[in-house]
Amino acid sequence: MAGTDSPAAARFVYRCLLFAPAIVVGLLLPLTLPPIAAAQRHTASDNPSTYNIGGVLSNSESETYFHTIISHLNFDQQYVPRKVTYYDKTIRMDKNPIKTVFNVCDKLIENRVYAVVVSHEQTSGDLSPAAVSYTSGFYSIPVIGISSRDAAFSDKNIHVSFLRTVPPYYHQADVWLEMLSHFAYTKVIIIHSSDTDGRAILGRFQTTSQTYYDDVDVRATVELIVEFEPKLESFTEHLIDMKTAQSRVYLMYASTEDAQVIFRDAGEYNMTGEGHVWIVTEQALFANNTPDGVLGLQLEHAHSDKGHIRDSVYVLASAIKEMISNETIAEAPKDCGDSAVNWESGKRLFQYLKSRNITGETGQVAFDDNGDRIYAGYDVINIREHQKKHVVGKFSYDSMRAKMRMNINDSEIIWPGKQNRKPEGIMIPTHLKVLTIEEKPFVYVRRMGDDEFRCEPDERPCPLFNATDSTANEYCCRGYCIDLLIELSKRINFTYDLALSPDGQFGHYLLRNNSGAMTLRKEWTGLMGELVNERADMIVAPLTINPERAEYIEFSKPFKYQGITILEKKPSRSSTLVSFLQPFSNTLWILVMVSVHVVALVLYLLDRFSPFGRFKLSHSDSNEEKALNLSSAVWFAWGVLLNSGIGEGTPRSFSARVLGMVWAGFAMIIVASYTANLAAFLVLERPKTKLSGINDARLRNTMENLTCATVKGSSVDMYFRRQVELSNMYRTMEANNYATAEQAIQDVKKGKLMAFIWDSSRLEYEASKDCELVTAGELFGRSGYGVGLQKGSPWTDSVTLAILEFHESGFMEKLDKQWIFHGHVQQNCELFEKTPNTLGLKNMAGVFILVGVGIAGGVGLIIIEVIYKKHQVKKQKRLDIARHAADKWRGTIEKRKTIRASLAMQRQYNVGLNSTHPPGTISLAVDKRRYPRLGQRLGPERAWPGDAADVLRTRRPYELGKPGQSPKVMGATPAMLGRTRPQQNILPPRYSPGYTSDVSHLVV
């Protein structure tokens, strides 16, 4: 055992434990430890009530704190269920890993520990924690490390049940990516050792960057990878390769000893001074020769053993509590000598531990699939003079977004060379002064507020230097040209200072007197003047390439091809409250309204005078149906026109119904025409532009009511000067020219300027942004935008080649889509709009003729109906007269028969009463006082027997005979009785004696 204390023996044991843990534990332990009975298993309802938590700690202070935390845990109901108690079992970490293995078996596993918390001194190496992990993992007992950060513990094939509350060293690659994104560095050189941790951090960086840069605009690429063997003696050979690379940003993972060698040799090559950026891991920060300006990372709570002990205990308690509520926990193994023990509950407990996510003393505690701590916080350290470490930022957990966030105060960073300005991070042979000008969408300019100290990530500072004032006004610029400048600076490796045009002009040349002499000289203004007079190195702006400018400056190949076009405002169309009436002309609307009421009136008249306007079903007891009144006719006409349901008041006559069908057809055509024309007003295009293009006669011969203009001193202004055929037009528009394109566009929108002639790119952008604007005609004066440089500039070819590559790679097309077509809120409007013609009487005359034909047809039909009805009435009258005559004749015949029968019965009756006289000799007289009607017909004195027939017909059956005797017995037939008409009850006639012409007998 003594030999294992030497460094060589320790390395040997470490390799044995690393590659053959099963051999060491499986062969050594059974030979040295007595066999112990296998662990007993509990049923599903027998979860243990006591849980022993083991601790392999590095000092007595940690042991005491571990015991205290376990004691306090038992009173925390949030983590400990009822009737559950935790106990601590601790041992001291031994530097000898073999002794550590025996101690774990004898003092921890023997006491049935359910998990082990392990810590060790940072200077003692990771052999002893590895031994604890091997031994516990063999029996599936979870191990929680609070200080081990080597990458080897992430290998679950070896450390099957190990997790830790500290992140491994190679997780610092995640922080590197955040820092590179913050500083916008695009090329880096990675320096790492060839051990497990060094290669792990390289792999982590490469793997994470593939997904990380999907969410950010700035992508960092690894230009060079430098790998070295640990225990360096010299790093000079690698520095030579690094010096020839373009990147000046170095990401280094090295131990403290190796970092000292690297910093020493880099200082000799002047690679730790101005313009270089060093970002290192924690170990390198502790080198005694770390250069000023180096940025490094330091894990928060890295040396807080108490905080990690507490977090590990509470993570374990949280996992056990959830496991108790979900499943049965078998007792922990107790025998290190039984290699057949398979504690499934330990494997399940390890899974529960990995799923924990709690807020502890060391921050947000959570684990990845390898059991490594995630959401660990880091301090960003800046090395100052005399090796002072200054915190300039933090990488911490954002609980609102549930992810990590980088926050760095750039103003507090001292960069290598004691510079306050952030290095560009690449090799820059020349620093250029670049000028630009505000021109949407190529350059947007925003003035910085008083409380702003830097521009937005997509902006670049572009101060405006006034010739009359030494101070600069701070502005921020972004846009098409700014992105082009950024990409150019990356591609051909130059840095720049960006500024705005001093006078806000592109520039044109003027003839000026030379010091009061008679000679004149040409002098350029604006951007051109700055470049010609060598006060600027480059112009990156929508600068049109033309012969006048090309004579004095160099142009690159065009980065944007365009031409000249005309911008005008579309004819406005007012919208009123009666806009819905626009599909029809006023005349047509009036005719439709009149037609509705005329048709209603005609329907009423047809139904009123039609003989069939009212009818009644045969054999029906219901009253006859009412005819269509005027109100119902109007309702019917409007209902048909507006396609509403007609529930009542419909025409009854055939003539009116024919008109109703014709009216329905008219309404269908009117409504369909109105609907179609209304849709045309809503969705079809407006009228075309007023101008057809530059060759429009109204432009060539400008009228007073048509004003056009451009920007004075611009390339368009020069184009009109060169074109002889446009000289007349130019003389007219010269007085109207504007100082800037922005002013002219605003006047076009207000209607003060009819036509603005300018570059097509800008005008198409404005037209696509505002539907009230439109470009007229085809392009003319085709040219392009180029990057301007000084005459003979060595950068011309490099810029030209870079722009050609941008065209081939699609970068320029990307800028077009981003800034010209999609750089603003697009309006869904077309280039032109057409207004449909308003429908008039001429268009709809056929419909009204159809209505007239319907009305005439209805009138004709009613005339035919009236004539036919008259003929029918005459025929019916003749039939009624004949029927009446026949009925009267029949009645007379029946009356006579009745009288004769009555007389015969009376005679028979009288014979029965007065047998002295025969029936034929007896005469009857009726008292007219009792029967006044008979008296009137017989005269003032007597009523004759024949005139009593009416009275006899009215007599009841019992009056014609004896009581109870039917009329048949008395000689009266049922037919005779049936022809009697109803009369009032009258008394039977009283016959009194009277005289006749024959006085031979007495009349009673």
Curated annotation (Swiss-Prot):
Residues 994-1004 have a biased composition (Polar residues). InterPro entries: ANF_lig-bd_rcpt, CaM-bd_C0_NMDA_rcpt_NR1, Glu/Gly-bd, Iono_Glu_rcpt_met, Ionotropic_Glu_rcpt, Iontro_rcpt_C, NMDA1-like_ligand-bd, NMDA1-like_N. One of its GO terms (cellular component) is postsynaptic density. It is a multi-pass membrane protein. Glycans are attached at residues 270, 326, 357, 409, 466, 493, 513, 705. The chain crosses the membrane at residues 586-606, 664-684, 844-864. Residues 980-1004 are annotated as: Disordered. Glycine binds at residues 542-544, 549, 715, 759. Residues 607-663, 865-1004 are cytoplasmic. One of its GO terms (molecular function) is glutamate-gated receptor activity. NMDA receptor subtype of glutamate-gated ion channels with high calcium permeability and voltage-dependent sensitivity to magnesium. Mediated by glycine. This protein plays a key role in synaptic plasticity, synaptogenesis, excitotoxicity, memory acquisition and learning. It mediates neuronal functions in glutamate neurotransmission. Is involved in the cell surface targeting of NMDA receptors. Plays a role in associative learning and in long-term memory consolidation. This is Glutamate [NMDA] receptor subunit 1.
